[in-house]
């Protein structure tokens, strides 16, 4: 899977796809003993710092594309929620709610007919994206890390 950024999505329509070791797409199936929501996993996979890890290890291609092959994604440090810790459960649930809200906002944006209406939704989406980054940063202890301060090369 070649991309210029992370693009992990939740499939609401159970679309069937194929994929081998390097794409074109992957699917995640939640194991029975996994308590984390797939929306939570989606959020963490899309988190900018996790994507920097993928990019730092991946094969690079023309046009700033890089591989999201299984070998670069399978061992990512997905933060496991301690479901005995009420603070972590609260953050998990906020992340899930924020992802669901983002999905709704993006659908509403796509339904809009005028540029000003679309721009309004873009601003709302940006607010929710920032909130999501903050929540995930808190879990990883990275509240003081900023994307622009880290060298992506």
What do the predicted segments below correspond to?
Residues 1-91:
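Polybasic, glycine- and aromatic-enriched phosphate-binding surface used to engage nucleic acids
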Residues 78-153:
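Non-catalytic DNA-recognition/assembly elements of restriction-modification systems
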């Amino acid at each position: 899977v070649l991309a210029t950024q992370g693009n992990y999505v939740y499939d609401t329509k159970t679309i069937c796809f194929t994929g081998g070791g390097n794409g074109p797409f992957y699917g995640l199936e939640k194991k029975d003993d996994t308590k984390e929501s797939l929306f939570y996993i989606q959020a963490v996979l899309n988190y900018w710092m996790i994507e920097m890890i993928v990019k730092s290890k991946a094969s690079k291609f023309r046009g700033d594309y890089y591989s999201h092959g299984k070998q670069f994604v399978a061992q990512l440090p997905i933060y496991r929620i301690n479901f005995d810790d009420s603070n972590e459960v609260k953050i998990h649930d906020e992340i899930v709610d924020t992802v669901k809200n983002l999905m709704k906002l993006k659908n509403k944006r796509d339904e809009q007919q005028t540029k000003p209406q679309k721009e309004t939704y873009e601003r709302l989406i940006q607010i929710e994206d920032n909130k999501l980054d903050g929540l995930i940063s808190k879990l990883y202890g990275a509240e003081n890390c900023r994307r622009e301060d880290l060298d992506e090369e």
